[in-house]
Amino acid sequence: MRKLLIFSISAYLMAGIVSCKGVDSATPVTEDRLALNAVNAPADNTVNIKTFDKVKNAFGDGLSQSAEGTFTFPADVTTVKTIKMFIKNECPNKTCDEWDRYANVYVKNKTTGEWYEIGRFITPYWVGTEKLPRGLEIDVTDFKSLLSGNTELKIYTETWLAKGREYSVDFDIVYGTPDYKYSAVVPVIQYNKSSIDGVPYGKAHTLGLKKNIQLPTNTEKAYLRTTISGWGHAKPYDAGSRGCAEWCFRTHTIAINNANTFQHQLGALGCSANPINNQSPGNWAPDRAGWCPGMAVPTRIDVLNNSLTGSTFSYEYKFQSWTNNGTNGDAFYAISSFVIAKSNTPISAPVVTN
């Protein structure tokens, strides 16, 4: 394995130049660098891929809330066991945007051009991730079919300040025996461009939460990967003045073929135990509903019954009943939900229709 990795690393270091650009501004942020820069393999069976290097997300002064770049990943992922993404946000002397901002990382589907959210996080108040040696960690193995070869990534932060946030992102690609050699992923729903571009909660809306999914006939395992975070302080409050959807604890349900099958508990995560505990004077310690400032937003995995293989079944994402009385703004749930199909034979992506 060591010889294989040395050969692969040498090939990647000979790759050309990539660029990072801001996509919300006419003034691009350009960064010339090697596609794979300064490989750091923590173990013999791990390859480290450097991607964004001190790129800034900001607003105003010709700056952009997002940055894009093209990077070279290993072409063959059949022996990749796991892929971990690490997001470092440095904020020396509290010089960054001091608020807890919604942020995420995307990979572009090379065929369709659609951006897939591979990880979401909420920035800490006032500080960066310096207390975590490698920053925030997110398992992105489910997207390994897209994290191969020349790969486009995007990082976004819902900041409204010119001082913004600065990021470096790298990936540990761990080789070994995967559970299945092949996998494919496709979004079921993505209402996640920002905290307030999510699904309105407690009022009528036109966003589709019902879909039909068809799994390939050679699927050996399939599951849903869902990321959810709520925003807003809408009333009526729950006990303890918990407004929706940032603070109100709720249970969401996924119905498969019209039967309530999976539940997502949006409750306390223990925000006060966050190792990034230097966020004062920010209000970081109280528990939100399913997320915390300065942490990655959890991904929720729901394994589908094997009897669904090769068939078309219905999917519906359902909220707990509650009505916004309109006296304190709106409530939103930013949601992305993907279906992943795995097999030991080459597999195509599941098909999702309305």
From Swiss-Prot:
Residues spanning the signal sequence = 1-40
Q: What Pfam families does this protein map onto?
A: N-glycanase_C
Active site, renumbered: D100, E158, E246
**Is-annotated flag, keyword Ribosomal protein?**
no
Looking at the record's lineage, which domain of life comes first? Bacteria
Residue pairs linked by disulfide bridges in the UniProt entry: C91-C96, C244-C248, C271-C292
What are the GO MF terms of this UniProt record?
A: oxidoreductase activity, acting on paired donors, with incorporation or reduction of molecular oxygen, reduced ascorbate as one donor, and incorporation of one atom of oxygen; peptide-N4-(N-acetyl-beta-glucosaminyl)asparagine amidase activity
Please tell me how industry or biotechnology makes use of this protein.
Widely used for the removal of N-glycans from glycoproteinss and glycopeptides in laboratory.
- What is the reaction catalyzed? Hydrolysis of an N(4)-(acetyl-beta-D-glucosaminyl)asparagine residue in which the glucosamine residue may be further glycosylated, to yield a (substituted) N-acetyl-beta-D-glucosaminylamine and a peptide containing an aspartate residue
Q: What is its EC class?
A: hydrolase
Could you give the subunit structure recorded for this chain? Monomer.
The free-text function statement in the UniProt record for this protein reads: Cleaves an entire glycan from a glycoprotein. Requires that the glycosylated asparagine moiety (reaction 1) be substituted on its amino (R1) and carboxyl (R2) terminus with a polypeptide chain.
Q: What is this protein called?
A: Peptide-N(4)-(N-acetyl-beta-D-glucosaminyl)asparagine amidase F
Q: Please tell me the species this chain comes from.
A: Elizabethkingia miricola
Which gene name belongs to this protein?
ngl
